[in-house]
Amino acid sequence: MSKQTQCVHIENCNINYESIDIQLYDNENITIPNCYKCSSQDNILICLECGIVVCMEDCKLHSNHSIFKIFHGDDKTLWCNDCNELIKESTMIEKCTKNSDLINKKLKDIENLFKVMKLFIYYDQRNLKYNKNFDSIDNSIKDIIKNSNIIKNEIKIENEIEIENNKIKEFIKLIKNDKCKNIIVLTGAGISVASGIPDFRSVETGLYNNENVSKFKLPFKEAVFDIDYFKFNPEPFYQLSKDLYPSGKFKCTPVHYFIKLLSDKGLLLRNYAQNADTLERIAGIPLDKLIEAHGSFAVSRCTNCGLEYSQEYIKDSIFNNDPLKSVVPRCKVVQCNNAVIKPDIVFFGESLPPIFNQNILDDINRCDCLIVIGTSLKVQPIASMVHFFPHFKNIPRLLINNQIVGENSFGGFNFNNNKNFDFKMIGDCQESVLNLSKLLNWDTELLNLINSKNHN
């Protein structure tokens, strides 16, 4: 192709002088890109008006713009689409060329960026620690990483996890060295969520969510478990209790079986359960080791005469499919005039069952370890049990929960003091218990227990 010195079309072109840098396109370290039309890398041009990358063949289709630069070509040579010829234009070339120091710095920054990305590939995020490939990275890039807030946060998390792992190992030693022979396990709704039973207080899935409040026109969200409101209108409770009632569809979780394993090993003093779903019973935790502090669906009674009714009788009412039939179970005794039957669960406004008060003081005196699992520690008096074992008694306390709870300066958890005996495993409580059993070398026993129960 011939090269003409002048082109009449240049004066009418809208060259993007601010963004286009011809020196960058001529840099031998830059890989030739593909044509956006045909993906070819032959005779590649860059439009100096819009920046689009196109081959010589397809640039004819790019008829709106005229002037193009050839990749890795003579930096004085341009291609005019309208003239269909190569042209020489020094003035425009100079305007489209940036300071070499600036472009070299940009290229260096890009190079560093890719090295940082390379380091992230080498960075073992799963184990939260640098692996041996870190040594192969340039020292200059290591400095970039060390000054990065992101990596600083990762390293901080790594250090915190390492500290927690070391503390948990201390807790493991206490159990393995027979320092914990009378363990109290305090459990809440969180241990049954994996069974499909909603956590009362969960905003999205809990029974206290706004949808249920609106649906049943409740005066306040906790009214469904308020004893005075139940006496006034038991319908909302029984409608919502379909999600809670033991109907055979809910299975025990690893946490339930872990507590059973503690009992089998003779280490469980008591399980204080805040759940009424009876899964502790189903898991096989002995009744003499179990305090259902908030009652249980296992037994129901007439609110008038106290006659006891079976779970089957209650289920027939709750799960009936007749839209004309109430879900509220009623007493069959004629003299009771269809009095409401209430399960033996503790409503707001009711006292805890006698078995709680009969055992709590003696259990506190005998307890040598407290494990708290899956609870918000918001409901009294159960929430105060943590305070019964203050730091100065050196009784180990382990919190297994999806978030830190129960921290305060009045006998609550204090995880920031490495000298005390407070431990935590924050995350999914089922996974945490499986990890705990593995650290104790109980994982095989726990899995065997889970499998044997599930096959029965």
From Swiss-Prot:
Binding residues for Zn(2+): 302, 305, 331, 336
SUPFAM superfamilies xref list: DHS-like NAD/FAD-binding domain
Gene Ontology terms, MF aspect: histone deacetylase activity, NAD-dependent; metal ion binding; NAD+ binding
GO CC, one annotated term: nucleus
Reaction catalysed by this enzyme: N(6)-acetyl-L-lysyl-[protein] + NAD(+) + H2O = 2''-O-acetyl-ADP-D-ribose + nicotinamide + L-lysyl-[protein]
Co-factor(s): Zn(2+)
Flavoprotein in keyword set: no
Cofactor note: Binds 1 zinc ion per subunit.
Alphabetic keyword roster: Metal-binding, NAD, Transferase, Zinc
Disulfide pattern: none
UniProt similarity note: Belongs to the sirtuin family.
Name used for this protein in its record: NAD-dependent deacetylase sir2C
Organism in which the protein naturally occurs: Dictyostelium discoideum
Gene name of the record: sir2C
